[in-house]
UniProtKB/Swiss-Prot annotation:
Quaternary structure (record): Homotrimer.
Catalysed transformations (reactions): a UDP-3-O-[(3R)-3-hydroxyacyl]-alpha-D-glucosamine + a (3R)-hydroxyacyl-[ACP] = a UDP-2-N,3-O-bis[(3R)-3-hydroxyacyl]-alpha-D-glucosamine + holo-[ACP] + H(+)
GO cellular component, one term: membrane
Family annotation (PROSITE patterns): HEXAPEP_TRANSFERASES (PS00101)
Family matches, as Gene3D superfamilies: Hexapeptide repeat proteins, MurE/MurF, N-terminal domain
Active-site residues per Swiss-Prot or TrEMBL entry: 237
InterPro entries recorded: Hexapep, Hexapep_transf_CS, LpxD, Trimer_LpxA-like_sf, UDP_GlcNAc_AcTrfase_non-rep
Protein name, UniProt field: UDP-3-O-acylglucosamine N-acyltransferase 1
EC id: 2.3.1.191
Domain of life: Bacteria
Gene name of the encoded protein: lpxD1
Role this protein plays: Catalyzes the N-acylation of UDP-3-O-acylglucosamine using 3-hydroxyacyl-ACP as the acyl donor. Is involved in the biosynthesis of lipid A, a phosphorylated glycolipid that anchors the lipopolysaccharide to the outer membrane of the cell.
Similarity field: Belongs to the transferase hexapeptide repeat family. LpxD subfamily.
PANTHER family in the cross-refs: UDP-3-O-ACYLGLUCOSAMINE N-ACYLTRANSFERASE, UDP-3-O-ACYLGLUCOSAMINE N-ACYLTRANSFERASE 1, MITOCHONDRIAL-RELATED
Upper classification of the organism: Bacteria, Pseudomonadati, Pseudomonadota, Gammaproteobacteria, Legionellales
Length: 351
């Protein structure tokens, strides 16, 4: 797709500095700039790199700049770059229809313009919303509801009674609604706690590949609107996540934990059961949160066990000083031993 800088600027509400008739057909990342492309550059070093490349033009933020290359200036260059990715590389459109190998149960309702791919199983009583896409080898349980414009990728399993919102994306091999890991030790054995609940995924959620979200013991495990979940995440039974959370890979959230809105879990965070996390908390990578803790609004937590950032940094600095402190204590102990020996000698002389 060829587009002039003038047309691109109109698309992203930007301003061209230089020849706006120049056309480009592709975008480039700053670390692999293709000849004749449009490259997004942020920061002085990256802009210089782009200027010295074979790029046709540079997408930059606002500000006064002289450049030998044509520029498109925008208020938010990263947002503009996302819009241009969709413009130059639009997602493949799948024609609606039901593949002949799909198995559709009794009283299943398929909305308008739905695609059901090869070997998909939809059990009885489930509802699939308008314009939704179910790719191959998906299993949809009994009485599941899926909203409009939702895309589910291959090998996903959604258990009975789960509720999936609109504009949701679920990536390959994720499992929604499996039993929670609930057992109690009785009479010398682990007695399984039955799970009769379900999972609610609200609108505009994206869930990565190979993630598991367990159903509640009773009621619902909830993933709030706009939340984005990475690959390889475990969300346990009866967890309730607020709106617009970010959960990075290898994070595990144990049962009955609740979060507010706009909470960020960096990679490999471990949250124990019955934790309450208020709005806008940030948990740094590999943070560990003990059971029944209450994390305060807007606080950044680090370490294991989790501590507010300033406290965690002081603790880490103190730990790093332990070898020096031990060395100093050893030296002082040796000096005290020498002094005691001298005092013992003098005491004997006095006697």
């Amino acid at each position: 797709m060829n587009s002039s800088l003038r047309d691109i600027a109109n698309l992203v509400q930007g301003m061209v500095i230089g020849n706006d008739a120049i056309t480009v057909s592709t975008l480039s990342p700053i670390d692999n700039i293709l000849p004749g492309s449009l490259v997004f550059a942020e920061g002085e070093d990256n802009i210089k790199l782009a200027e010295n490349s074979e790029a046709a033009a540079i997408l930059i933020g606002q500000g006064t700049i002289d450049s030998p290359k044509p520029l498109i200036q925008v208020k938010n260059p990263f947002k503009a770059f996302i819009a241009l990715l969709n413009h130059f590389y639009p997602p493949r459109r799948i024609s609606p229809g039901v593949h002949p190998t799909a198995v559709i149960g009794a009283e299943v309702q398929l909305g308008d313009e739905v695609y059901v791919g090869p070997f998909v199983v939809i059990e009885s009583g489930s509802i699939i919303g308008n314009h939704s896409v179910l790719k191959s080898h998906i299993h949809i349980g009994h009485n599941v509801v899926i909203g409009d414009h939702t895309t589910i990728h291959p090998q996903v399993t959604i258990y009975d009674n789960c509720r999936i919102g609109s504009n949701v994306t679920i990536h390959a091999s994720t499992v929604i609604g499996s039993d929670g890991f609930g057992y109690t030790f009785v009479d010398g054995q682990h007695l399984k706690v039955p799970h009769s609940g379900y999972v609610v995924i609200e609108n505009n959620v994206e869930i990565g590949a190979n993630t598991a979200i367990d159903k509640a013991t009773l009621g619902a495990t909830v993933v709030g609107e706009g939340t984005k979940i990475d690959n390889l995440v475990q969300i346990a039974h009866s967890v309730k996540l607020g709106k617009h959370n970010i959960i990075c890979a290898f994070t595990g959230i144990a049962g009955s934990t609740t979060t507010g809105n706009n909470v960020i879990f960096a990679a490999n965070v471990g949250v124990s059961d019955h934790v309450h996390i208020e709005d806008e908390v940030i948990l740094g990578a590999r943070t560990g949160v003990p059971p029944h803790k209450h994390l305060k609004k807007g606080t950044v937590y680090l370490g294991n066990p989790a501590k507010p950032k300033d406290v965690a940094i002081k603790h880490e600095l103190s730990v790093n000083r332990i070898p020096l402190i031990r060395k100093n204590i050893k030296s002082l102990t040796e000096q005290v031993a020498v002094i005691n020996k001298k005092l013992d000698i003098k005491a004997k002389e006095v006697e």
